[in-house]
């Protein structure tokens, strides 16, 4: 049996993996656990009562976290004319059309989010094999294909997270950094849960919000007592 590291031993002494913690206590414990050598993200996994094999039960969306993610986000925008100018004024890092497409084809993907005006999708669509596997393909369901490119840029810069259920019906996303105050993390988590409730598929039967767990990038997961969330 592998020997536990000092960090693993310290973590085991602080948490009970079988326990469900009130949300504020769970987030507070994450801040107290021995950390890695970098500022870890706080991540959440939400098990939803959906059948991910059915296309009408895939949950996909985006949430603007009230306290941001703690990350600097670079945004690329495919737009022209007035929309391009609006994107630049909103703080987009890269704005273009065919020239930006050539950058992408050349392997220059120095951005975290891609936004596209509807009339740019003819150009963007051809980049699907490059952007798609990297999770960068714009999509109207998460607000990244929109006439309001300026609004999309501002949302991305403000800390918008995008998510989609995986094959197990689970949503994964980061809700901040471990050095955030507990209240800020709790507000971010609650914003996500509130939006997920709004996205409940009409055909979802039984319990929708089944389990919520929080963790740091390199740390263990803590189950959250659902009664401590506003659902």
From Swiss-Prot:
Q: Which UniProt keywords apply?
A: Repressor, Ribonucleoprotein, Ribosomal protein, RNA-binding, rRNA-binding, Translation regulation, tRNA-binding
The record ties this protein, via InterPro entries, to:
Ribosom_uL1_bac-type, Ribosomal_uL1, Ribosomal_uL1-like, Ribosomal_uL1/biogenesis, Ribosomal_uL1_3-a/b-sand, Ribosomal_uL1_CS
Q: Show the GO cellular component annotation of the record.
A: cytosolic large ribosomal subunit
Sorted alphabetically, the Gene Ontology BP terms of this entry are: regulation of translation; translation
Listed GO MF terms = rRNA binding; structural constituent of ribosome; tRNA binding
* Pfam annotation, one family: Ribosomal_L1
Function according to Swiss-Prot or TrEMBL: Binds directly to 23S rRNA. The L1 stalk is quite mobile in the ribosome, and is involved in E site tRNA release.
Q: Could you give the subunit structure recorded for this chain?
A: Part of the 50S ribosomal subunit.
Q: Which PANTHER family does this chain map to?
A: 54S RIBOSOMAL PROTEIN L1, MITOCHONDRIAL, LARGE RIBOSOMAL SUBUNIT PROTEIN UL1M
Q: Which HAMAP family match?
A: Ribosomal_uL1_B (MF_01318_B)
Q: Which family does it belong to?
A: Belongs to the universal ribosomal protein uL1 family.
Full protein name: Large ribosomal subunit protein uL1
* Protein species of origin: Alkalilimnicola ehrlichii (strain ATCC BAA-1101 / DSM 17681 / MLHE-1)
Q: What taxonomic classification does the UniProt entry list for its organism?
A: Bacteria, Pseudomonadati, Pseudomonadota, Gammaproteobacteria, Chromatiales
The gene designation is rplA
